[in-house]
């Protein structure tokens, strides 16, 4: 017989004969199970891409298809939750406020923004999921690039124009947008 420590409570449980130990799984509540599936799906899509088979994900999780579909009715629903978790949850409204701050010079804004931006987005799961999406269905990459185009790039173009002593009143040109998308592509390449 040996003494076993309950990992959840840290308390010692009754003595159990050594040969009668069986693996028991603690039943998770709904929130914990959904979080477990989502966290593992993020790792799974970062490793296998967006075309990874859900049957392999369920096998890795040790759950049935039925349970997976209880929380995420379709693969697309799961991918949308992955997008929200990996991309939307990391988006910082402070970036927009920083770029709009009239008290800072363009150089100060660029330095502060790109330092924080790269530290936030250049993670294994962010970069790999973005690249895998770009290589397959574009569902995530298109949404992320639209977010960049609508909320960041116009501000970055405005600050670049200020730095170059050019007019900041006209809409960004296609050429300017492409230039900044190329810059962001370079950042991901370095990452």
Task: Give, region by region, the residue ranges found by the protein language model.
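Amphipathic alpha-helical linker/stalk segments
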Residues: 82-112
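Short acidic/histidine-centered micro-motifs embedded in hydrophobic/aromatic stretches
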Residues: 57, 85, 129-133, 147, ...
């Amino acid at each position: 017989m040996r003494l076993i420590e309950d990992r959840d409570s840290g308390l010692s449980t009754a003595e159990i004969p050594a040969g009668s130990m069986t693996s028991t799984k603690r039943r998770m509540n709904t929130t914990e199970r959904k979080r477990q599936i989502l966290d593992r799906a993020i790792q799974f899509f970062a490793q296998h891409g967006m075309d990874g088979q859900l049957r392999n994900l369920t096998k890795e999780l040790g759950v049935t298809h039925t349970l997976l579909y209880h929380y995420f009715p379709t693969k697309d629903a799961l991918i949308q939750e992955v997008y929200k978790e990996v991309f939307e949850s990391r988006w910082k409204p402070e970036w927009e406020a920083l770029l709009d701050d009239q008290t800072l010079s363009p150089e100060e804004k660029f330095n502060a923004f790109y330092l924080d931006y790269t530290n936030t987005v250049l993670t294994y799961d962010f970069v790999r999921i973005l690249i895998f999406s770009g290589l397959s269905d574009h569902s995530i990459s298109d949404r992320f690039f639209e977010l960049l185009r609508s909320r960041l790039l116009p501000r970055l173009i405005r600050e670049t124009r200020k730095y170059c002593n050019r007019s900041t009143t006209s809409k960004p040109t296609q050429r300017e947008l492409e230039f900044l998308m190329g810059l962001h592509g370079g950042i991901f390449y370095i990452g």
